[in-house]
Amino acid sequence: MYKIEKVSPDVVRPLRHKVLRPNLPFEASCLPSDNDPDAIHFTLKKDDTILSVASLYSESLEAMPNKNAYRLRGMATEPAKQRKGFGAMVLHGAMDHLKKETDVEILWCNARVT
């Protein structure tokens, strides 16, 4: 059974480093806003194995500065588990949390293909 959990930033960093910044020092996986009070970090797990992670930060969108916005960053899925929908699952869990627990109006991101 799959489970989405809200976690500390230390929990998401190993997978974030492995997938997004493997050729950089581990510290490169620490994003500047990781410990902000409004930062939220999620894992998707099966049993005790983390399959996917995502982090959300309270950050306005330049094109809509008057809207309450969160930014998605540091999203990663275990390489052997990619293309199976796990990224979508953790993202939907994060969006459900925002809808229930915040007054956010916009969720935005900058995307890259790795």
What kind of feature is each model-predicted range?
Residues V11, V113-T114:
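Short alpha-helical
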Residues M1-R13:
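A short beta-loop-alpha structural element at the N-terminal edge
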Residues T77, R83-D96:
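Conserved acetyl-CoA-binding loop-helix of GNAT-fold acetyltransferases
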Residues L91, L98-R112:
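Conserved GNAT acetyl-CoA-binding A-motif
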Residues T43, T49-S60, R71-A76:
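Conserved beta-strand in the GNAT
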Residues R16-D47, L51:
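Active-site rim helix/loop that mediates acceptor-substrate recognition in acyltransferases
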Residues E59-L72, Q82, E101-E105:
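A conserved beta-turn-beta hairpin within the catalytic core of GNAT-like acetyltransferases
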Residues D10-H17, A88:
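Short amphipathic alpha-helical segments
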